[in-house]
Amino acid sequence: MLVTAYLFLLGLLALWGVLEFSACHSKPSASSNALGNPAFRQFQYDFYRTYFPALAADWLQGPYLYKLYQHYHFLEGQIAIIYVCGFGASVFAGLVSVPLTSRLGRRKSCILFCLLLSASYLCKLSQEYFVLMTGRVLGGFSSSLLFSCFEAWYTHEHAEQHDFPAEWLPHTFTRAAAWNGGIAIAAGITANVCAEWLGLGPASPSVLAVPLLVLSVVLVIREWDENYGQTSSFRRVCGDGLRCLLRDRRVLLLGTIQALFESVVYIFIFLWTPVLDPHNAPLGIAFSSFMAASAVGSSLYHLATSKKYHLQPMHVLCLSILMVFFSLFMLTFSTAPGQEHPTESLLAFLLIELACGLYFPAMRFLRRRLIPEKEQTGVLNWFRVPLNLLAGLGLLVLHDSDYQSGTRNMFSLCAVTMLLALLCVVSLFTMVRNDSELRLPASEPEPNGTE
């Protein structure tokens, strides 16, 4: 299992490199004006050197979070409750994060994110169940702030302070998304070195992340100016979002697809460690392999929707759901009690991550076309509620004391969930198949971005 994980990682990194090299040399740069502007390059660099340490700190916790709770001798059900608390915090944070950052200020919100995540990581040094639960709640809340506050600050400064053209924005976020994939891969390898090679234990990656957050805070305080968003009442934002959901069946179907798909992904995040860890898999390397597979999926999406192949995002969305269903079907057999096949399970997990790399840009495109910009915040808030509830209920109801049979049952239910998502996609496709608004024109490249 050890050698297999390393081979998968090396193969995926090589494939990602080939795809990115091909993409860079097969299309002319649309950002030549931006790249030729030294003021823009400096502004972009100043943003990246503050944003990337925060991203790295967020990723470092991923590989050994479940292992840490297991290391403290908590039962599977107790660990599930800790995760559910994190999901609950994410629901609440998703509802209040945008109004909060607008009222408090984006710069202060970035500092708040770093402080909350640092506190969350320091809580992991305790073996007290309540302290660990509190840390997970803080982590769930802070993660919802990460993308909203940093990217909102940059977008405002880009347009209002520096008066750069709006078409230069995708260039910054495309590069950020590419770097984010590389940072996640590096974070997994670094966590593996700390926890396993150096023998520092599963809490060490979280401790290592704190100095990165301190660096990010120092740079924000020293170099960033404050900016604010338009303040709207929480009731109005959610009310407008609910009305949009109810009046447009396409939006309702899209939200259902997102809730079903992403709740399965959340359950996968919980389950991959107890499936692979008993077979001595290097968890950090496995995590880096997942991130590499997701990066490959994102590159394949942009290749598939390019002028050469011209697949539509709706087709890619359907393909990603089919891939996840097939992977979950594999997992119901590879995790059968007494007949475990860890290599097949790892392969299935990699297919799920590959599908995620296809899914997120396709979903982002469809959301942008279907949901009016002024109502997106409210609609996305409503999307997040069933997403987190489904994931939380799945963990609480199905994960019984015998984790092996419980895990297999969870994968079976997740496969059924993906079938429901597939039915929703077919229904949505039938409804919009002649809608040119939801088709990607041959001349329009789909910009990448963080999700």
UniProtKB/Swiss-Prot annotation:
Keywords: Cell membrane, Ion transport, Membrane, Transmembrane, Transmembrane helix, Transport
TM stretches of this protein: 1-21, 45-65, 79-99, 130-150, 180-200, 201-221, 251-271, 281-301, 316-336, 346-366, 378-398, 410-430
GO biological process: monoatomic ion transport
Subcellular location: Cell membrane
The UniProt record lists the keyword rRNA-binding: no
A GO molecular-function annotation: molybdate ion transmembrane transporter activity
Keyword Membrane among record annotations: yes
Intrachain disulfide bonds: none
CC per GO annotation: plasma membrane
InterPro entries linked to this entry: MFS_trans_sf (IPR036259), MOT2/MFSD5 (IPR008509)
Membrane topology: Multi-pass membrane protein
PANTHER family membership: MOLYBDATE-ANION TRANSPORTER (PTHR23516:SF1), SAM (S-ADENOSYL METHIONINE) TRANSPORTER (PTHR23516)
Functional summary from the UniProt entry: Mediates high-affinity intracellular uptake of the rare oligo-element molybdenum.
Stated name of the protein: Molybdate-anion transporter
